[in-house]
């Protein structure tokens, strides 16, 4: 298993895990919080691999502006071969957290 911090604040794509040649990035669990109302989703390079996560105070989450998942051995989502794992943000606001992942074939 490998671990990555989520430290993003730019509108658009923010690289969380760099691409690994010939490999996929399989996300097992994640947790993050934002400093304001915004939307976020994970991408394999530029292709969305999750639905939109609405980081606002109208959803039930670990914090008023956060998203989290339970740990699982089968994985939640993965990138395409040789592509980076990115987090896309809809507004400029600080987002921080962490994720656990595997590098697979």
Language-model features and meaning:
Residues 1-105:
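Beta-strand-centric surfaces of beta-sandwich/beta-rich domains
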């Amino acid at each position: 298993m490998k671990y990555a911090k989520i430290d993003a604040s730019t509108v658009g794509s923010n690289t969380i895990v760099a691409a690994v040649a010939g490999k996929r990035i399989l996300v097992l669990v994640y947790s993050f919080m934002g400093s304001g109302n915004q939307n976020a989703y994970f991408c394999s390079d530029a292709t969305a691999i999750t639905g939109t996560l609405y980081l606002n105070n109208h959803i039930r989450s670990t914090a008023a502006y956060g998203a989290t998942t339970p740990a699982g051995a089968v994985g939640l989502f993965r990138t395409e071969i040789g592509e980076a794992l990115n987090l896309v943000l809809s507004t400029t606001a600080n987002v921080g957290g962490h994720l656990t992942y595997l590098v697979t074939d």
